[in-house]
Amino acid sequence: MKNLIKALKTISMAMIAVLMSVSFVACNTDDDNIVNLNLKGRWYTKTESVNNLLIINDDNSIVSFKVSNYESWENVKGNLTVDGNEISIYFEDGNSLSGTCTMTDNILTINTTNGEYKYSRLADETNLVGDWNYSNITFSAKAIKDEIVIPGGTINGVEVPPTVMQTAQLSGEFIKFAAQRYFRNIKFNNDGTMAYNVLKDEGDLSLTKNYSIDGLNMTVSGETAGHKIASTFMVLQSYDNNTAYFIFNKENIAEMFIGYALMLFEGGIAPDVTDEALNAYKKAFTEAFDYYSVEFIINRAK
């Protein structure tokens, strides 16, 4: 039974990747004239269980990236052929699909026998320099343990007890609360630093961290209450450059939580986190959840 479920899950996720990859085609435009469009670049869509990024290259080769409830980062490669507005998609894993599409205002609508899918064109490169405001966050997770136990020990002569976190503490409501409280206003600078205001009972607190962007990956690093932390996740930007999407799976969201976890130590004075401690926490976190995915959205300030 377990093998059957696993097989069905694999097939379903593969089909999602195939269905979502038909956007690299020659499409009908909004005036119904069939034209060959240059669809090179990045396209993005989201369903109930999958955040999907599609990349089309000059040679009509395709790469489909996704973060789903059941998987970490995954990519599927393929190619397409076009005949008018009829397209055929072929993937290296043996899957294929045919369909048609239309495009209006940089929105691709994909019509297949299995339904309709809409993709938004993204910017080819991400540039976050400027002021941003929190917009929204979506969350999906399933805990398989009630607790996350962060190992203790003696670090730099300080006896640090194990820390126990309830997985219920890391629910969608907690994520939304934290995002609204800690990332209401964000400023990205040209020098690779970012500043944001934290809402505290006694007033706003301004914090500064470092950031870097390499293709689809963004890394944020710095110190939280004296603890060195870093997290790398996927970053995407809308075609008009006014919306940015930060996408986390359970491995890299664990890195973001390490600062919060360390604050639970008595007095908040635990020594700087080591690679060993970070790996122990990430292991405990990922083992506590079947899946955990977050999409954090910000809009450019007006």
Annotate the PLM regions.
Residues 2-14:
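Bacterial N-terminal signal peptides that target proteins for export
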Residues 22-26:
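C-terminal motif of bacterial Sec signal peptides marking the signal peptidase cleavage site
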Residues 30-77, 83-206, 214-302:
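Lipid interaction determinants
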